[in-house]
């Protein structure tokens, strides 16, 4: 759309398998703008070039099954960029791409957001992507946001025990050979969440009060929102964490 665009993890949720790529891209453009077919085709060609698809003129004539999984994902990202939307929601869109193309697409998305003022919600498990891409980060556990703040504050000085464990489980070149932190237990079923805080059965900071659902609070001087009865102190934690930093 021209207001909100979605990039799915599986590109086949975006692409119609029986239509050529140019048909799908031109249709997406002309549904929102009064462009002739040649103008729309040129914009579609430029979008494919933006996401690193070689020979875009020829690839426009192809069908989705003629692309690899990574190439199909690039096409779906190009479709999302076509109409310069106000908001892009991206659900792990670079999972199937190699590191070089991933970096290129992240650069193009950043450039688009800076030039047009487009807001971006990037859903991912890759903290290195978040560190390099995001201004703010929301950490979710069992379907709820447990910590939210500026990306450098949260990744460098986590306060929620789950955030701390999540960052500690990422390999770091600064701690080569050292054992990774492990969060004990298993993620609970959303159909049978424990009473109170959903993380309390796995949490090293758990107290009796965690049996009641925590409210969102903003600890003084922390620069973030947190949903926790027993948060960790942010002071001095950076030396224990892997080398992930937004700075």
What residue spans do the PLM features occupy?
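P-loop NTP-binding/switch modules centered on Walker-like glycine-rich loops
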Residues: 89-93, 97-178
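A short, proline-enriched helix->beta-strand linker immediately N-terminal to the Walker B motif
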Residues: 82-86
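ABC-type ATPase nucleotide-binding domains, specifically the catalytic core motifs of the NBD
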Residues: 21-39, 49-54, 66, 149
